[in-house]
From Swiss-Prot:
The lineage of its organism: Eukaryota, Metazoa, Chordata, Craniata, Vertebrata. Pfam families: ABC_membrane (PF00664), ABC_tran (PF00005). The chain crosses the membrane at residues 44-66, 116-136, 186-207, 215-235, 294-315, 330-351, 710-730, 755-775, 831-851, 853-872, 933-955, 972-993. Coiled coil: none annotated. InterPro entries: AAA+_ATPase (IPR003593), ABC1_TM_dom (IPR011527), ABC1_TM_sf (IPR036640), ABC_transporter-like_ATP-bd (IPR003439), ABC_transporter-like_CS (IPR017871), P-loop_NTPase (IPR027417), Type_1_exporter (IPR039421). In mouse the MDR gene family includes three or more related but distinct cellular genes. It comes from Mus musculus (Mouse). The gene is Abcb1b. Residues 391-627, 1033-1271 form the ABC transporter domain. It is a multi-pass membrane protein. This is ATP-dependent translocase ABCB1. The modification Phosphoserine is found at S659.
Length: 1276
């Protein structure tokens, strides 16, 4: 359905299969969860809390209408007393015994009524606490379960589901949408029942006290209910659209932040901002429409309410004058109905919150309810006692779910005997990796059977199957924990001795032991702090500790240097003994000893045999071997020593912040455990120390909408003043009946006052509409602006900011999703209500001082107590909000890591481990929610009960003032009405305290990010922009340490020079500083000492954007964006519109055009999240095309051909050789054959240049370079 299609991220078009499915589903799905469905995760205790909370809310809702009974009787007492007092005052000049008796009896009667008020207040104190705290407790418990269930559901989905769903949205749903559910099913439900009960009790009391008048007023009530119901329905629809748009924006943000180095290197910040802004604009427009709809509904409701007042008093007057009712009975009926209808008005924010929650829950519950066809948590399925390891693929056909038109396997037949090693060879994208994925049952074949020991793997228990398989993939993923913990992901019960044994076998022991903290070293997000070779060896160790029956090696040694590869290959050869092994390798020298080599072509196996047999057949394998042999004159099929092995202090990392653009120094992962704890505590200290911003600072963010805010404030002030004006009119009507006027005068006065009510209704319609519309629009613009500004500021930061663990993708996307909506919580509609309530209270107090200052002074003492309750509540909740925010960021980080690395988690069968980690991270917010429930309950009940106590004091003292002839009852009523409505408004305002508390915390974080200016400012317009760039690069005495590891030197006085048009090759052992050279040239960091020059100008003097625009980079494991192939290639140059002809030309140069042209959607084919729909070789060639379309002056190649098969590599290498012509080029490569023609080869060791010269010169020196070449020759 379109609802789903809107959630698919970047591209507007989707795969045709999904499109067809969408239309079909549109009719089947509803956009909101059912009312009772919202509480599907409530257990008996939650239900008990909700039942008791509802009972308390019902009692609470009944107490206020009961108060009106007391009030009616009290009014009759007053009017009778005043009627007897006035003639006495008129007729006597001196003291009168009748007057004294009347006065004393009035005071006695009022004392009794005061006790009633106090008793009702005490009841409210208890039930209001129970109502709020129990509903908050129940909500906190359910949200805790929903978060866990949702995360479990995500972990339980099959890989095919992730292929057709935008994973970027899932984190937004885990934060923003779940918090919307929390808002909707907590205390607001209690308030809803309270309001409904007040409505019902009000009408019941109205009927009992005076059914005639009640029926007349009721004539208007259905219209009020109808407008509310219609509004709620429209609101749900708008809310869904708004959530979809924000989820899409969240997906964009996550994708961009996860690939931040790629975005920065290609200057894509503005393009990404525009893409993000497009989704925000959509959400804003929906929000404004929602505000307009809501405003019209509220305006109509108030118009109808005031019209009913006019009708009530007009008809009530007739009933009093005909002696059917007393004035007290009229007021009892009127106020009971008034409270009932007003309580319907109070339903609005509660209905809105619940409607929002229902909309948010729809997608979440849909994912929870989705039953995967491959269920990794299922206990069903066969679990054989022993596995021999005989594998068979029989007539297997397969298409990926996201590209159903593209056939990958077209009838694959393959047998692997127990203990055999079978090598799969063939061109990139022919189906080799797909075979490995089907073996793990990440997907099921469309036709045919995959079997183990003759058993169809679909009948075997999924978890059992995956646990007997060890996988090492081409792009290994490590998790943000220690090296030891990463290896333990292979098998949970593994001992430290077994870990050490595995890392020795994987040739990782030496580099680990050289680290200050050895196995306790943190590897960073996605292993970003290690070089590719180090990551690969840890991944191999992780596979070996599983002691698997079946070993799947997909380019397992591609990231290793020559020396490491030889040792690791030997370890893998040893590990293969007694195991069934499937190997995929582009370097054919690593598979020549395989028992069977299977040649793939077009999704089927076209030849099988051992190396010698296939060489004699002279088919596909022979052709690949010959191509590779010709290409590798120095070291056939091998890497050069020197990119990624041991303690890499600077290597161009394959997975940097999940953006494999630049290899980061291993030393930046050198955390002691206590160091980690220290930094975490520092993080907390930093968060705590952020000063909470003032309301005016938050308002300043909305200042450009001042015309809207001004109109909104004026309308809110008018709406606030209408209540005290109502008090004047109301007191005058009561006053009419306490005077001894004739009937006709009374009728005329009452008719006039009734007309005033109608005028007030018309004014309210206009002012409530403009109040809602202007504040609503300003609030939506604010939300959009804040999200945009924060995202823009994030993209502005330098790389060192992203290096900080607290700025992980998960944390940043969580902040983006939740902070902006929290700030809106202090603005928009809530600000309107607060302004209105302040105006209400302020005007009420001023009027009261004019008409009865003595009584007002008493009330002015009481009101601060109500306000104090609100302030205490806000302070306490602010502290809780800060703790919640920090802890939910940690949860968000875990969730993001799990979602983004889902394939690895599934292969390792570690879904439950991540669930446990996620559940543990939710404990602090859960405990805080439990505490918060009681805090909110106590403060809410206090502010509510204080109103009743203030009534008791008001009327007791009022009776005394009337008895002493210091005030008339008319004025007592005026002061009472003005202050009652003002106090109710103050109490209502305090209920916004939790939202305002959250808003202040969020605003503080937002402003800190927005105001942060980085040292290397990507947005800066300063700096030189030479008209001509030749491409002379010079490093002069450069010293550099990474900002997060200031005590570990990386470059120690490096000096080198490359002239324009020259190719410079950097070689050396891992950790020597090769990659740091490239990072400093990209100006991701600045050197601590020494200088980097470009054409004789220090690069610090050059404009950053201009500098990067002239550099083109191709990395070992490139990141692609979830958009079309054409858009990915065009991303190479974001400064202009790249024509389709240029895209095609670049694709042809990168040897990818033919493949693209064979796809149904050709260049419009989406590549999936991070390019997952493509093979490694296809991704690499698209990345090369992306760099070539840029036409850079300086080309930076980090293992640019490492992921390619032999045939592709040869053609691409030729393309790169051609691309290098006339350009300065810096190359880092394992295969020395690819750099032997370089103009200058520089050997770096320990951050300094040790050797430099041409290939022949360095061979003649017989130094380090010569040793590398010899090592390569032995491997050939």
């Amino acid at each position: 359905m379109e609802f789903e299609e809107n959630l698919k991220g970047r591209a507007d078009k989707n795969f045709s299969k999904m499109g067809k499915k969408s239309k079909k589903e549109k009719k089947e799905k509803k956009p909101a969860v059912g009312v009772f469905g919202m509480f599907r995760y409530a257990d008996w205790l939650d239900k008990l809390c909700m039942i008791l909370g509802t009972l308390a809310a019902i009692i609470h809702g009944t107490l206020l209408p009961l108060l009106m009974l007391v009030f009616g009787n009290m009014t009759d007492s007053f009017t009778k007393a005043e009627a007897s007092i006035l003639p006495s005052i008129t007729n006597q000049s001196g003291p009168n015994s009748t007057l004294i008796i009347s006065n004393s009896s009035l005071e006695e009667e009022m004392a009794i009524y005061a006790y009633y008020y106090t008793g009702i207040g005490a009841g409210v104190l208890i039930v209001a606490y129970i109502q709020v705290s129990l509903w908050c407790l129940a909500a906190g418990r359910q949200i805790h379960k929903i978060r866990q269930k949702f995360f479990h559901a995500i972990m339980n989905q099959e890989i095919g589901w992730f292929d057709v769903h935008d994973v970027g949205e899932l984190n937004t749903r885990l934060t923003d949408d779940v918090s919307k559910i929390n808002d909707g099913i907590g205390d607001k439900i209690g308030m809803f029942f309270q309001s409904i009960t007040t409505f019902l009790a009000g009408f019941i009391i109205g009927f009992i006290s005076g059914w005639k008048l009640t029926l007349v007023i009721l004539a208007v009530s259905p219209l009020i209910g109808l407008s509310s119901a219609l509004w709620a329905k429209v609101l749900t629809s708008f809310t869904n659209k708004e959530l979809q748009a924000y989820a899409k924006a969240g997906a964009v943000a996550e994708e961009v932040l996860a690939a931040i180095r790629t975005v920065i290197a290609f200057g894509g910040q503005q393009k990404e901002l525009e893409r993000y802004n497009k989704n925000l604009e959509e959400a804003k427009n929906v929000g404004i429409k929602k505000a307009i709809t809501a405003s019209i509904s509220i305006g109509i409701a108030y118009l109808l309410v005031y019209a009913s007042y006019a009708l009530a008093f007009w008809y009530g007057t007739s009933l009093v004058l005909s002696n059917e009712y007393s004035i007290g009975e009229v007021l009892t009926v009127f106020f009971s109905i008034l409270l009932g209808t007003f309580s319907i008005g109070h339903l609005a924010p509660n209905i809105e919150a619940f409607a929002n929650a229902r909309g948010a829950a729809f997608e979440i519950f849909k994912i929870i309810d989705n039953e995967p066809s491959i269920d990794s948590f299922s206990t069903k399925g066969y679990k054989p006692d022993s596995i021999m390891g005989n594998l068979e693929f029989k007539n297997v056909h397969f298409n990926y779910p996201s590209r159903s038109e593209v056939q990958i396997l077209k009838g694959l037949n393959l047998k692997v005997k127990s203990g055999q090693t079978v090598a799969l060879v063939g061109n990139s994208g022919c189906g080799k990796s797909t075979t490995v994925q089907l073996m793990q049952r990440l997907y099921d074949p469309l036709e045919g059977v995959v079997s183990i020991d003759g058993q169809d793997i679909r009948t075997i228990n999924v978890r059992y199957l995956r646990e007997i398989i060890g996988v090492v993939s081409q792009e290994p993923v490590l998790f943000a924990t220690t090296i030891a913990e990463n290896i333990r992901y292979g098998r949970e019960d593994v001992t430290m001795d077994e870990i050490e044994k595995a890392v020795k076998e994987a040739n990782a022991y030496d580099f680990i032991m050289k680290l200050p903290h050895q196995f306790d070293t943190l590897v960073g997000e996605r292993g970003a702090q290690l070089s590719g070779g180090q990551k690969q060896r840890i991944a191999i160790a992780r596979a070996l500790v599983r002691n698997p029956k079946i070993l799947l090696l997909d380019e397992a040694t591609s990231a290793l240097d020559t020396e490491s590869e030889a040792v690791v290959q030997a370890a893998l050869d040893k590990a293969r003994e007694g195991r069934t092994t499937i190997v995929i390798a582009h370097r054919l020298s690593t598979v020549r000893n395989a028992d069977v080599i299977a040649g793939f072509d077009g999704g089927v196996i076209v030849e099988q045999g051992n190396h010698d047999e296939l060489m004699r057949e002279k088919g596909i394998y022979f052709k690949l071997v010959m191509t590779q042999t010709r290409g590798n004159e120095i070291e056939p099929g091998n890497n050069a020593y020197g990119s990624q092995s041991d303690t890499d202090a600077s290597e161009l990392t394959s997975e940097e912040s999940k953006s494999p653009l630049i290899r980061r120094s291993i030393y930046r992962s050198v955390h002691r455990k206590q160091d980690q704890e220290r930094r975490l505590s520092m993080k907390e200290a930093v968060d705590e120390d952020v000063p909470l911003v003032s309301f005016w600072r938050i308002l300043n963010l909305n200042l450009s909408e001042w015309p809207y805010l001004l109109v909104g404030v004026l309308c809110a002030v008018i709406n606030g003043c209408i209540q005290p004006v109502f008090a004047i009119v109301f007191s005058r009507i009561v006053g009419v009946f306490s005077r001894d006027d004739d009937h006709e005068t009374k009728r005329q006065n009452c008719n006039l006052f009734s007309l005033f009510f109608l005028v007030m209704g018309l004014i309210s319609f206009v002012t409530y509409f403009f109040q809602g519309f202007t504040f609503g629009k300003a609030g939506e613009i604010l939300t959009k602006r804040v999200r945009y500004m924060v995202f823009k500021s994030m993209l502005r930061q330098d790389i060192s900011w992203f290096d900080d663990h607290k700025n992980s993708t998960g944390s940043l996307t969580t902040r983006l999703a939740s902070d902006a909506s929290s700030v809106k919580g202090a603005m928009g509609a809530r600000l309107a209500v607060v302004t209105q309530n302040v105006a209400n209270l302020g005007t009420g107090v001023i009027l009261s001082l004019v008409y009865g200052w003595q009584l007002t002074l008493l009330l002015v003492v009481i009101i601060p107590l109500i306000v104090l309750g609100g302030i205490i509540e806000m302070k306490l909740l602010s502290g809780q909000a800060l703790k919640d925010k920090k802890q939910l960021e940690i949860s968000g980080k875990i969730a993001t890591e799990a979602i983004e690395n889902f394939r690895t988690i599934v292969s390792l069968t570690r879904e439950q481990k991540f669930e446990t980690m996620y559940a543990q991270s939710l404990q602090v917010p859960y405990r805080n929610a439990m505490k918060k429930a009681h805090v909110f309950g106590i403060t809410f009940s206090f502010t509510q009960a204080m109103m009743y106590f203030s009534y008791a004091a008001c009327f007791r003292f009022g009776a005394y003032l009337v008895a002493q002839q210091l005030m008339t009852f008319e004025n007592v009523m005026l002061v009472f009405s003005a202050v009652v409505f003002g106090a109710m408004a103050a109490g209502n305002t305090s209920s916004f305290a939790p939202d305002y508390a959250k808003a202040k915390v969020s605003a503080s974080h937002i402003i800190r990010i927005i105001e942060k200016t980085p040292e290397i400012d990507s947005y800066s317009t300063e700096g030189l922009k030479p008209t001509l760039l030749e491409g002379n690069v010079k490093f002069n005495g450069v010293q550099f340490n990474y900002p997060t590891r200031p005590n570990i030197p990386v470059l120690q006085g490096l000096s080198l020079e490359v002239k324009k048009g020259q190719t410079l090759a950097l070689v050396g052992s891992s950790g020597c500083g090769k990659s740091t050279v490239v990072q400093l040239l990209e100006r991701f960091y600045d050197p601590m000492a020494g200088s980097v020059f470009l054409d004789g100008k220090e690069i610090k003097q050059l404009n950053v954007q201009w500098l990067r625009a002239h550099l083109g980079i191709v990395s070992q494991e490139p990141i692609l964006f979830d958009c079309s192939i054409a858009e990915n290639i065009a991303y190479g140059d974001n400064s202009r519109a790249v024509s389709h002809e240029e895209i095609v030309r670049a694709a042809k140069e990168a040897n990818i055009h033919q493949f693209i042209d064979s796809l149904p959607d050709k260049y419009n084919t989406r590549v999936g999240d991070k390019g997952t729909q493509l093979s490694g070789g296809q991704k690499q060639r698209i990345a090369i095309a992306r760099a070539l379309v840029r036409q850079p002056h300086i080309l930076l190649l980090d293992e640019a051909t490492s992921a390619l098969d032999t045939e592709s590599e040869k053609v691409v290498q030729e393309a790169l050789d051609k691309a290098r012509e006339g350009r300065t080029c810096i190359v880092i490569a394992h295969r020395l054959s690819t750099i032997q023609n370089a103009d200058l080869i520089v050997v770096i060791e320990n951050g300094k240049v040790k050797e430099h010269g041409t290939h022949q010169q360095l061979l003649a020196q017989k130094g380090i370079y010569f040793s590398m070449v010899q090592a390569g020759a032995k491997r050939s």
